[in-house]
């Protein structure tokens, strides 16, 4: 028995649009464009037979999963799993790349390389 796994990134979020690093903070949510992206993704994926949908519990991921789920004829219970959380970027969360480069130059260079 083989398993097929599809990974989908969340749609455009408010932090993405503002150029802010998100990490695990849950202050960002989908923009109108992000909802459109999720709907389009669902329309593409709805011809594939899925057994389950898993999502990070973060708003931006959960909103994406819910929008994708609407595209299927079958109703799914979305399984929210903390193991799917974004990498925690601690003090970088909520900052722009430029702010990080300025404030945490050495750490940024290590992370980037």
Task: Describe the predicted segments one by one.
Residues 1-50, 66, 71-74:
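An N-terminal RHG(E/S)-centered segment typical of histidine phosphatases
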Residues 18-21, 106-113:
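Short, basic/glycine-rich phosphate-binding loops at helix/coil junctions
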Residues 40-109:
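Phosphate-coordination/substrate-recognition cap region in phosphate-metabolizing enzymes
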